[in-house]
């Protein structure tokens, strides 16, 4: 095999990096061995006239390989599984004197030992785990082959050639884009590293192109649908382009560990011009607010066409795009949400909340933040680089939080290893362990410089970890896959193991932790609706025979969902007298006018209550967050819901606020029903309703979902969705 271009290697034989699927080197159509005698016509030997790949959606190849949903007219197969190719020759094939083989090539500088040049021999029987081609039909001038790929081969877009051997050299077909073949990971193949043995799980984690993302607050969980769109036109090529932009060597693209790690770095643009720019400051000039996106398709296609990072994303957007990337390539993946997620820069398993001596929060000393929720991904794969038992779900996170080996990425970290405290195993397990296992420490910073630990809350962080249930839109609690229940012996052993294997010990604090107080405090927040007043109820319970007086402080803040406060909108001090063995409730009215002018896009409020028992100097502290209920978009359809037939979709929104909404963008998406689209309204006045109608022509049958979002200068995170059942086109 010869190269079409020669490269100067500076006195050292080396092959340049092969890190672009899009780059090509053509193989020569003729490779002669010696001099061809005069009068010999090479065209008299067996010649290929055409190649058929059976690549239509309804053909066996795509149906058997579960790739019939891809909007791509090329052949798409999954590795480790046989597929059919038919070759037409210039004359009938005679196995006694004719010799040919199929060749697959990817990238430039193809090498057999790197897996970038694959000669596929004709064999009598296919062998599991090996490339091979078996003749399953000979008819006239045609030969049909059953070709089996290796379950470890590179994932990407291959160029296909047919080579015929003659006494004088090799005759090879010309480069033909129509025979290009995509090879993907195969969760249906037992020998593939991403093999998943449950069909319902494969349908959910590989083939489902619509998901549900959980957000909000642990006591007020909210949901939104997300269009992954992994089968949409152009998405597969974009996912390969993402790896090209990372300059990932092609020889590593068959390893799901490497692919998922590269993906976690490339979905964010922090240090590598990746897909999405993150922004958490509520300012989204020259971009789209994170809450406005309805799915991954627009984001990925814009990244591919502009070749520049797309603005803007936050954790659930990064997770949604990353899920598309993984599922598109064939790696089973899901989005998980961790409620009360610790962002622990030191991974020391401790989140410190510093208090003044009077009980107020010391914002200068308090640096750690607890996110109301954080979304990341899990990808399913074996981990041959780890001891037995640590395969399966791996945590991977593309939200740029911490630097890992010089880049902003996280994982894959074995969820099983995290649960048992084996944080020594790569990649980034200590960080994920801290996200779900840190303690919340309340510390009084005394004026003399000493610190006193007032309270330790070991159950606040990682309160609930959830994902979408299989086959439905409900919530599945997976907390016990990450951690043992608090207080169990296994939980203590996991923590000791994590400390032994490298997690940092909690910082030492001066003084001795105080004994449990005789007074308990808790508070509840009423269901809070955007633009309405609501109440907060604080309950004090005296468990002793003593009489106590209490001075309590309430701090109400507008916060980012990451737990970082933007502004304090209410501060209140009150005194409470508790008789022996009694309880008392204090109600605080939160008025809409106090918070409306400063709200951030997720309408998240955080309440911090501290109380000092004057007689004992004990400090009680509790904090809770709430997400205001935001009005929804209404979606309606009329007309026949049939593949290929027009149906009208109406998007409707009524402004319930007392102020005019300006610069309103409405987004509509629905994989298989409509391409992503958007419409702008200059303003929506109070109590006014706007409507937007579009005619759609579905191209995918079955259960589908329409998803809409609305964003404006002063109101965001407005969603709506509608389930539709698209019928097949009636046969004639």
UniProtKB/Swiss-Prot annotation:
Gene Ontology MF, one: protein-glutamine gamma-glutamyltransferase activity
Swiss-Prot/TrEMBL catalytic activity: L-glutaminyl-[protein] + L-lysyl-[protein] = [protein]-L-lysyl-N(6)-5-L-glutamyl-[protein] + NH4(+)
Cofactor annotation remark: Binds 1 Ca(2+) ion per subunit.
SMART domains the UniProt entry points to: TGc
Resulting phenotype, residue 416 to R: In FA13AD; mild; no effect on intracellular protein abundance; no effect on protein-glutamine gamma-glutamyltransferase activity; no effect on alpha-2-antiplasmin to fibrin cross-linking activity; no effect on fibrin alpha chain and gamma chain cross-linking activity; decreased clot fiber thickness
Chain segments annotated as coiled-coil in the UniProt record: none
Recorded disease: Factor XIII subunit A deficiency: An autosomal recessive hematologic disorder characterized by a life-long bleeding tendency, impaired wound healing and spontaneous abortion in affected women.
Protein name: Coagulation factor XIII A chain
Gene: F13A1
């Amino acid at each position: 095999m010869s190269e079409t271009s020669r490269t100067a290697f500076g006195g050292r034989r080396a092959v340049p990096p092969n890190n672009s699927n899009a780059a090509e080197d053509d193989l020569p159509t003729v490779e002669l061995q010696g001099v061809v005698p005069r009068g010999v016509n090479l065209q008299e030997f067996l010649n290929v006239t055409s190649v058929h790949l059976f690549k239509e959606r309804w053909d066996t190849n795509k149906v058997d390989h579960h790739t019939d949903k891809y909007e791509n007219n090329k052949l798409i197969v999954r590795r480790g599984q046989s597929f059919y190719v038919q070759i037409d020759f210039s004359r009938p094939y005679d196995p006694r004197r004719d010799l040919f083989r199929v060749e697959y090539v990817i990238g430039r500088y193809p090498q057999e030992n790197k897996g970038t040049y694959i000669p596929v021999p004709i064999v009598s029987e296919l062998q599991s785990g090996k490339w091979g081609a078996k003749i399953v039909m000979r008819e006239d001038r045609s030969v049909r082959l059953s070709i089996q790929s290796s379950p470890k081969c590179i994932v990407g877009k291959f160029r296909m050639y047919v080579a015929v051997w003659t006494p004088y050299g090799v005759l090879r077909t010309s480069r033909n884009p129509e025979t290009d073949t995509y090879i993907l990971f195969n969760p249906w193949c037992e020998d593939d590293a991403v093999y998943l043995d449950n069909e319902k799980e494969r349908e959910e984690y590989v083939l489902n192109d619509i998901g549900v993302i959980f957000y909000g607050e642990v006591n007020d969980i909210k949901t939104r649908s997300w269009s992954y769109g992994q089968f949409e036109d152009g998405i597969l090529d974009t996912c390969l382009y993402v790896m090209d932009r990372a300059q990932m060597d092609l020889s590593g693209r068959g390893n799901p560990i490497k692919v998922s790690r590269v993906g976690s770095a490339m979905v964010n643009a922090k240090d590598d011009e990746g897909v999405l720019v993150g922004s958490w400051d509520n300012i989204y000039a020259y971009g789209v607010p994170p809450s406005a996106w309805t799915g991954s398709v627009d984001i990925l296609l814009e990244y591919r066409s502009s070749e520049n990072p797309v603005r803007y994303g936050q954790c659930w957007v990064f997770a949604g795009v990353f899920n598309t990337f993984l599922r598109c390539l064939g790696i089973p993946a899901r989005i998980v949400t961790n409620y009360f997620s610790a962002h622990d820069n030191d991974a020391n398993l401790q989140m410190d909340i510093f208090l003044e001596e009077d009980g107020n929060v010391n914002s200068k000393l308090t640096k750690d933040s607890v996110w109301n929720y954080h979304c990341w991904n899990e990808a399913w794969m074996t981990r041959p680089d780890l001891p037995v038992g640590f395969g399966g779900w791996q945590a991977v996170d593309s939200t740029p939080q911490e630097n890992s080996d010089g880049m902003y990425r996280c994982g894959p970290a074995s969820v099983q290893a995290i649960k048992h405290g084996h944080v020594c195993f790569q990649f980034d397990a200590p960080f994920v362990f801290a996200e779900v296992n840190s303690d919340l420490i309340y510390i009084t910073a005394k004026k003399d410089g000493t610190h006193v630990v007032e309270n330790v809350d070991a159950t606040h962080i990682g309160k609930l970890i959830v994902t979408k249930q299989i086959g439905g839109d409900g919530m599945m609690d997976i907390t016990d896959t990450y951690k043992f229940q608090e207080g169990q012996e296994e939980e203590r052993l996991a923590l000791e193991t994590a400390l032994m294997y490298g997690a940092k010990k909690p910082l030492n604090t001066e003084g001795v932790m105080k004994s449990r107080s005789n007074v308990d405090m808790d508070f509840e927040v009423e269901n809070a609706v955007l633009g309405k007043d609501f109440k907060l109820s604080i309950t004090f319970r005296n468990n002793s025979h003593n009489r106590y007086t209490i001075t309590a402080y309430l701090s109400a803040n507008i916060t980012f969902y990451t737990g970082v406060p933007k502004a304090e909108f209410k501060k209140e001090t009150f005194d409470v007298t508790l008789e022996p063995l009694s309880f008392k409730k204090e109600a605080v009215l939160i008025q809409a006018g106090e918070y409306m002018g400063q709200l951030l896009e997720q309408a998240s409020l955080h309440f911090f209550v501290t109380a000092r028992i004057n007689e004992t100097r004990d400090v009680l502290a509790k904090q809770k967050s709430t997400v205001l209920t935001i009005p929804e978009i209404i979606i309606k359809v009329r007309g026949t819901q049939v593949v290929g037939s027009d149906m009208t979709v109406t998007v409707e929104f009524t402004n319930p606020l007392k102020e005019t909404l300006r610069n309103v963008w409405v987004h509509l998406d629905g994989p298989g029903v409509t391409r992503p689209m958007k419409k702008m309204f200059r303003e929506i006045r109070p109590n006014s309703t706007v409507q937007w109608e579009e005619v759609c022509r579905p191209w995918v049958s079955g259960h589908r979902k329409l998803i809409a979002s609305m964003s404006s200068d002063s109101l965001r995170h407005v969603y709506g969705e509608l389930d539709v059942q698209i019928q097949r086109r009636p046969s004639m």
